[in-house]
Amino acid sequence: MEIPKDEKIKFLKELVEIYSPTGKEEEAAKFIKEKLEEYGVKAYIDKVGNVIGVKEGEGPLILLAGHVDTVPGYIPVRIEGDILWGRGSVDAKGPLSALLFAMVESNANVIFAGLVDEEGFSKGARALDVPRPEYVIVGEPSGVNGVTIGYKGSLTVRFVERVEKFHGSIGGGAAEKLIERWLSISGNFEDGFNGLSGRIVRFVAYERDFEFYGEMIVNLRTPPGYEPPRDWDIIDFVPAYEVNRRSPLVRTFVRSIRELGMKPKLKKKSGTADMNILAPRFGVDAVAYGPGDSRLDHTPYERISLMEYLQSIDVLKNVLTKLKGKDLDKIYKSSPR
């Protein structure tokens, strides 16, 4: 089935017009479900609100997973030339829409998942109940010629200090102890994918009748192999994930991008995505791919090139065609790095 380009653009614009911050994804999920059914894809909404589409076809089962929710902050939706403005255009309704149309226009064996709560605690990815796929492709902005092969982990920790009250002339209380703790942690920060980084998410300190009380919540972006201290009060921890660049899935993306006249770029990102959850959970290789500049994520300037959006659909269709019914390990066994 071939879908006209203007229909693909219309769908993306209408999806972006549905404001769907985390926790309010229901309308957008229903919109996607109706469109999938219109294209002849079996679709349903699961118990946590994920919208699932199932298209039986040829070759190994491939999971195409994006997220329906966005961060808060409405941006008026408009098209100016080649550019679509709006919250979620890049992160990640553009990539999600590209996955949808690649599935519809191919005859690969695909499960499509529009997940909820990715910008929260990934409730949708954790609760996803589908058959084990052979490969996972996550819809996140990588740029039309980019493939994301790694994301750092995300660790959210709470620190609490209680200090018996004393006269202010003596010295520091709970707040000062928390500051010392933060300086100790941040002193180990390093740039790059293999370094630890982070920020303070919440900091409160006040006096009670007989004590100084302080609470600090921090979010750390963790490198591969990082293990937090066991005595920390961990709210949530999603370890880093990195796929082998020699994986058949990665090589298929590289070849597909080259065949469309572009120079492929492999990327490792300091953020965290549902790929970190889905790949280890299913025990399969995963990459993230999609149109858009991730530097615009969460900003008031979020916008996407419609030409890049349409090109990314072609890349994904090429990938699905190559993955379909081939022994990729044999094809790439003797290929150069």
Swiss-Prot record:
Q: Which GO terms describe its cellular component?
A: cytoplasm
Pathway(s) of this molecule: Amino-acid biosynthesis; L-lysine biosynthesis via AAA pathway; L-lysine from L-alpha-aminoadipate (Thermus route): step 5/5; Amino-acid biosynthesis; L-arginine biosynthesis
What does the record give as cofactor? Zn(2+); Co(2+)
Q: Which reaction does it catalyse?
A: [amino-group carrier protein]-C-terminal-gamma-(L-lysyl)-L-glutamate + H2O = [amino-group carrier protein]-C-terminal-L-glutamate + L-lysine; [amino-group carrier protein]-C-terminal-gamma-(L-ornithyl)-L-glutamate + H2O = [amino-group carrier protein]-C-terminal-L-glutamate + L-ornithine
Q: Answer whether the UniProt record assigns the keyword Amino-acid biosynthesis to this protein.
A: yes
Q: Where in the cell is it found?
A: Cytoplasm
Q: How is the cofactor bound?
A: Binds 2 Zn(2+) or Co(2+) ions per subunit.
Enzyme Commission number, as recorded = 3.5.1.130, 3.5.1.132
List this protein's GO terms for biological process: arginine biosynthetic process via ornithine; L-arginine biosynthetic process; lysine biosynthetic process via aminoadipic acid
List the InterPro entries.
ArgE/DapE_CS (IPR001261), LysK (IPR010175), Peptidase_M20 (IPR002933), Peptidase_M20A (IPR050072), Peptidase_M42 (IPR008007)
The record's comment on protein family reads: Belongs to the peptidase M20A family. LysK subfamily.
Q: Which NCBIfam families match?
A: dapE-lys-deAc, PRK04443.1
Q: What is this protein called?
A: Putative [LysW]-lysine/[LysW]-ornithine hydrolase
- Protein's organism: Pyrococcus abyssi (strain GE5 / Orsay)
